[in-house]
Amino acid sequence: MSSSLVGSEMCIRDSYFGIQKTEKVAIHSENRPEWLIADIGVQAIGGITVGLYPTNPPAEVQYLLSHSESKILFAEDQEQVDKALEVLDEVPNLSKIIYFEEKGLFRYDSEKLMRWDEFLEIGKEEYEKNKDFVNFCIDEIKSEDVALMIYTSGTTGPPKASMLSHGNMAVSYTHLTLPTSQY
């Protein structure tokens, strides 16, 4: 499966959940392929990815989800899902928690929870019907639009959000292709 197809299908899925340009989607996970796939889909629709440290305790998870006004949370596993569920009542904007690993979550019962594989099934037909939607979304993104919100660790006070634009990301990607002797 090509990276553009993955991004396109993720874009359609995010749209299915009502994510639109400038809306935030949080990812609470260690580095893994699903993290990148979710991130590509959020950015393709013009949404803003909010990264959470896997070590954030529940109180910080609540603060970050509330402050960023995230609508969806991609969570790695039971540990991260438990943190989100503990503060769910204090995060009214959060409509869905999509988890990557099922271990330990079989008996959890919340309408806000969804398995990653279930999420991936959504939108396959929609993608076939709406391929132009993805190009429309991407064409609407401007280089100055925010792509990522990265929070500080909050050692001197509440965590603060640093916002990186699509233009910032494009410059970073360009530099990844340079030989290391050039920087």
Regions inferred by a protein language model and the residue ranges of each:
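Single conserved hydrophobic/aromatic residue that forms the stacking wall/gate
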Residues: 1-7, 12, 175-183
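Tryptophan-centric aromatic hotspots in well-structured domains and transmembrane helices
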Residues: 3, 35-36, 53, 63, ...
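Short aromatic/basic micro-patch
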Residues: 4-5, 74, 113, 140, ...
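Conserved AMP-binding/adenylate-forming
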Residues: 13-59
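Structural core segment of the AMP-binding/adenylate-forming
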Residues: 17, 44-122, 136
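Domain-wide signal for the mature, well-folded portions of proteins, strongly enriched
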Residues: 27, 46, 94, 99, ...
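AMP-binding/adenylate-forming
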Residues: 47-50, 65-77, 147-150, 158-176, ...
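Conserved pre-ATP/AMP-binding loop-to-beta segment of ANL
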Residues: 114-117, 124-151, 158, 181
